[in-house]
Amino acid sequence: MPRRDLVRIVLVGDDGVGKSSIITSLIKEAFVTNVPHVVPEVTIPPEITPENFTTSIVDTSSNPRSRPHLLSSISRAHVICLVYSIADPSSFDRVAEYWLPLFRREGINVPVILVGNKIDLRGGRVTNQGLEDESAPIMREFKEVETVVECSALLPLNVSEVFYFAQKAVLHPTAPLYDSREHTLKPKCLEALKRIFTISDVDKDGLLNAHELNQFQQKCFSTPLQSQELDGILEIVRSYDPYAVQPLPSSSPNTPLSRDSSYGQLHYFNNNVVPPSPPQEGITELGFLYLHTMFIQQGRMETTWTVLRKFGYGESLDLREDFLAPKFDVPSDCSVELSPLGNQFLTDIFEAYDKDQDGALSQNELDDLFSTSPGNPWLSQGFPDTTITDDMGRVTLQGWLAQWSMTTLLNHRTTLNYLAYLGYSSSPATDLPTPTALHVTRPRKQDRRQRKVTRNVFLCYVLGATGSGKTSLLRSFVNRPFKGGEDGLGGYEPTTKVLSVVNSVEMEGVEKYLVLQEFGSKYESEILRNSKRLDMADIIIYVHDSSDTNSFSYISNLRQQYSLDHIPSIFVATKSDLDLAQQRHEVQPDVYCRRLGLQAPMAVSSRLGPLHNLWVAITRVALDPTSSLPRGPRSQMSPAQRIRVVARWGLAATTISAIVAVWMKWQGYSFKGIWGWMAKFAGLRT
């Protein structure tokens, strides 16, 4: 939900309590003796308020004849100022007996500010404690009551504060954050603040040190944290709970800074004077939560709301849609990759959660990493078997970056979501919108036309008959062991869902990522009929079992059934460790490929492995796609383009024939003579 640009304040209460006088005192900045019974609606323009929103102030009457206007006004209110007269105790009694129950009966669910007017008529002094004791029973029973303000329209005194608290109740409401009955943070607020603490804890040591607190302060309030302020924060938290302030681990980076400066601002000294270090202590999550509880209890809700909004939260304490899914347009024929900033952020977060520094993320480390998000986005896709892991099945940095490269290529929206969840926009290294972590590539057609591919991630569709060894190829690509039984038999499992794997291939010192997708018989035809899905493919890998006489026919039939010649292709003959079988096809695979102008099928064995030469060959095709287009340059046209070309030639031929016919008729030829003339012209008749 976006921030409001209008705050509608409605004043309600018994007649004679001074509602109209409060409004006129605000506008005139002085008491006005003769005021209308109901003041017309007042609009305060946005430039008057520091937060740049329009304020509308509506007066009402409790007269029964004005009841429709009263009910209409409170139904459209963003906040209600319920006014009573300190000089008339019965008007205070009616707050709980009449007015607040009326709001509930009418289904009004907005903040209420209790306003005690005419304090100039009170006899004797009332302490803050006395005022709190008087209003506490009402606030306990009616949670919609945000605060109590006393004022005098006559003096005037505290009049502007009435409207300040009313505006604040709308822009920075207490109800979503704090349970005033239990005196605790509400669950959603607690969850959000815990996530913010985790993201702000850059080194993931469970503490916010001086450097991290300064970065937090800069992000949320655009001002550095002074050393005295930090000392005060530590003292406040320590007085609440000594265990909420802990010594920093020896490995925690806490940059030494000048004590007369702000933490986080680095100074260099040439006089050999070593500046004092910042406190070697940090606040725990408990201490961080206590600070925000204290802010709210002190009426400083705007502090907590500023923090929440800076970290992407909306009024409902959910991450905003525009924060999770910002506008990011991808032109047709282009793909999306991680930018250098995105790669660096994902590298940094991997290293931060690799607590044992063994170069791989265990399951517990992965769980911690995704704790600020809805969870691991790849669980249903077979992760971590989709990428590179160590011998114990733990994802490595290479596999981690490869997995994100695949995710970004296949569904960049997921990457944008998770960059937000993981704190990219809150990272001290970036503090930039999440789209800066992504990069839109040049169109494929432009790459092919200029014969220079600028992309780094390529999508390869793996097609072939059931049992041809497609899944084994995918497993081999991510260094998974061969699953076949004796003599390659007994280990076959049919593919029932889309399988995607990713790995990098080094070409002349540069890493390129290949994403291999297998669809299985259930989804293959659906993909091949979908022109948009086909256009996403950089390469088609046609796989046949060289030991199965019927395997290659499947590929030939597939190519006849679907228009695939506009996609670069490579043919692979699997199970080369078994006896070569003569294919039941009009021509053998090598001849078939030669007729297409392609290399003969590469013979491979997933059982014997490794298949490095195959991956290099596929990457070469990706980098020089025009060299592997079936039947040469004409095949670069998509099926739709071919239809348009044929239609244009057909139209041209029809037009020419019509012109010739008209001309010949004008010359006096009969149609029989015309066809004879045309045949003679074509050399078909002697």
UniProtKB/Swiss-Prot annotation:
GO-annotated biological processes: heme transport; mitochondrion inheritance; mitochondrion organization; mitochondrion-endoplasmic reticulum membrane tethering; phospholipid homeostasis; regulation of mitochondrion organization
Annotated TM spans: 649-665
Membrane topology: Single-pass type IV membrane protein
Subcellular location: Mitochondrion outer membrane
Record keywords: Calcium, GTP-binding, Hydrolase, Membrane, Metal-binding, Mitochondrion, Mitochondrion outer membrane, Nucleotide-binding, Repeat, Transmembrane, Transmembrane helix
Pfam family, one: EF_assoc_1
Gene3D superfamilies, alphabetized: EF-hand, P-loop containing nucleotide triphosphate hydrolases
Enzyme Commission number: 3.6.5.-
Chain segments annotated as coiled-coil in the UniProt record: none
Binding positions for Ca(2+) 1 per the UniProt entry: D201, D203, D205, E212
Cytoplasmic side: 1-648
Residues noted as binding GTP 2 in the record, renumbered to the chain: 464-471, 506-510, 574-577
Membrane topology, Mitochondrial intermembrane segments: 666-686
Source domain of life: Eukaryota
Domain called Miro: residue spans: 4-172, 455-624
Binding annotation for Ca(2+) 2: D354, D356, D358, E365
Official protein name in the record: Mitochondrial Rho GTPase 1
The species this protein was found in: Cryptococcus neoformans var. neoformans serotype D (strain JEC21 / ATCC MYA-565)
